[in-house]
Amino acid sequence: MLGGIEAGGTKFVCAVGREDGTIIDRIEFPTKMPDETIEKVIQYFSQFSLQAIGIGSFGPVDNDKTSQTYGTITATPKAGWRHYPFLQTVKNEMKIPVGFSTDVNAAALGEFLFGEAKGLDSCLYITIGTGIGAGAIVEGRLLQGLSHPEMGHIYIRRHPDDVYQGKCPYHGDCFEGLASGPAIEARWGKKAADLSDIAQVWELEGYYIAQALAQYILILAPKKIILGGGVMQQKQVFSYIYQYVPKIMNSYLDFSELSDDISDYIVPPRLGSNAGIIGTLVLAHQALQAEAASGEVRS
């Protein structure tokens, strides 16, 4: 049996399940200070006989396995969690193999193995909510360089009629600064869920998302793009994305996915809100396999 932790800035989801993505049991609770939160995590998992645990965490995180601080949450504004040794703490408490990555990487893994990208060798999972993040899988592996991708902070072309300055405290009018949930609320004076019947809101949102997707397509050329997160619960935004992506690409890449079949290419997650927690079970299984391969697996 495997354990998974989807650690978000507002809530934690913990689950136990199997390597095939089956969830057997799960629990949710608010994200508090680290000691209080991790105590609840350990109490929950102590009920089960687990072989390994996977963590998909809010970030930024140190996701470099060669780093001395691998598995640490780094420059987060979340109170108490800055420089928190998440991976090592769980490992010390549970004394079993622990896999680690970002929450959006976990969601990408879930959709890659069991959801919309099953059977493909590449995909891009983007979450648009309180922030904007992405996990990319290329040739069957999560993309990792100096850091995990920070695709929410690319610059996009501002709509000529949009005078909003942007919400990102680092970059102002980057993708996250213009299209995240807090940006929508700041621009229009209401939360996204309360603006569902105002077409202007979602056309502008679709325009900005399409700007970003065009860049990702040109750079990564993923075989499937999956859009999740709270903002994407407003399904009407997809029609504007489907309208703007081909216009922006302007037939530069001649693939049917970008024209006739675009609604099969840019999709919501098949696993819904379970994509991330299922992905953490994948991370747990990978950690178990890695330890077995190194000859250190416990009997």
Swiss-Prot record:
Keywords: ATP-binding, Carbohydrate metabolism, Kinase, Magnesium, Metal-binding, Nucleotide-binding, Polysaccharide degradation, Transferase, Zinc. Its EC number is 2.7.1.4. Zn(2+) binds at H153, C168, H171, C174. Induction: Up-regulated by konjac glucomannan and by cellobiose and mannobiose, the possible degradation products of glucomannan. Repressed by glucose via the carbon catabolite repression system. Also repressed by GmuR. GO terms for biological process: polysaccharide catabolic process. Inhibited by zinc ions. CDD domains: ASKHA_NBD_ROK_BsFRK-like. InterPro entries: ATPase_NBD, Carb_Metab_Reg_Kinase/Isom, ROK, ROK_cs. PANTHER family: FRUCTOKINASE (PTHR42742:SF3), TRANSCRIPTIONAL REPRESSOR MPRA (PTHR42742). GO terms for molecular function: ATP binding; fructokinase activity; metal ion binding. Belongs to the ROK (NagC/XylR) family. It holds the Pfam family ROK. It is an enzyme of class 2 (transferase). Its cofactor is Mg(2+). Seems to be involved in the degradation of glucomannan. It catalyses: D-fructose + ATP = D-fructose 6-phosphate + ADP + H(+). This is Putative fructokinase. It comes from Bacillus subtilis (strain 168). ATP binds at T130, P182, G230, V231, M232, Q233, Q234.
